[in-house]
């Protein structure tokens, strides 16, 4: 990431707002907008956040679930710890069965909300990056089949591409 990207980031109003309001990322506001409109996360819910680092979505989820809910965040990268007793961070690859088993253990096999803001490591080759993004999304759908409660909520952010209508279920 070059200095141009750094300058653009620091001039971004949501980046500035996140820093001012002590959110871990500007992505927090996208989830807040979605939740305001669709009432995705409720007090007491169990929430799984795949691709959680740096923790912006998990942070919003923790605010919404209160003390009775649980939030499990999973990412390949380190997630700076939250000092909340109902947050569990897992550093690992959610596409791997061993990590999925740990998530199932922590949630007792059920989640009311499954959300993913995961993105692949970018190569710079648009079509390849898109295919890798779709693979992650398909993995999230498979995990949802196993863990998401009936009437649960699934939120996935992914790269936009013309082939989504052909590839996704």
Residue ranges of predicted features:
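Class I SAM-dependent methyltransferase Rossmann-like catalytic core
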Residues: 2-43
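Conserved class I S-adenosyl-L-methionine
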Residues: 43-53
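Class I S-adenosylmethionine-dependent transferase superfamily signal
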Residues: 61, 103, 140-144
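S-adenosyl-L-methionine
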Residues: 74-121
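Mobile active-site "lid"/loop adjacent to the S-adenosyl-L-methionine
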Residues: 91-94, 109-155, 162-165
């Amino acid at each position: 990431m070059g200095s141009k990207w750094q300058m653009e980031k620091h001039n971004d109003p949501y980046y500035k707002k996140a820093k001012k309001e002590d959110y871990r990322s500007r992505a927090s506001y996208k989830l807040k907008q979605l939740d305001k409109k669709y009432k995705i996360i409720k007090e007491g819910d169990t929430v799984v956040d795949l691709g959680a680092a740096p923790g912006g979505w998990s942070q919003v989820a923790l605010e919404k679930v209160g003390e009775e809910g649980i939030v499990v965040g999973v990412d390949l990268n380190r997630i700076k710890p939250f000092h909340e007793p109902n947050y569990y961070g897992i550093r690992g690859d959610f596409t791997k069965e061993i990590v999925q088993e740990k998530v199932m253990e922590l949630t007792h096999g059920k989640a009311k909300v499954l959300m993913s803001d995961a993105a692949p490591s970018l190569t710079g080759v648009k079509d390849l990056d898109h295919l890798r993004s779709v693979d992650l999304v398909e993995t999230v759908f498979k995990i949802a089949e196993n863990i998401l409660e009936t009437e649960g909520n699934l939120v996935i952010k992914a790269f936009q591409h013309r082939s989504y209508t052909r590839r996704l279920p």
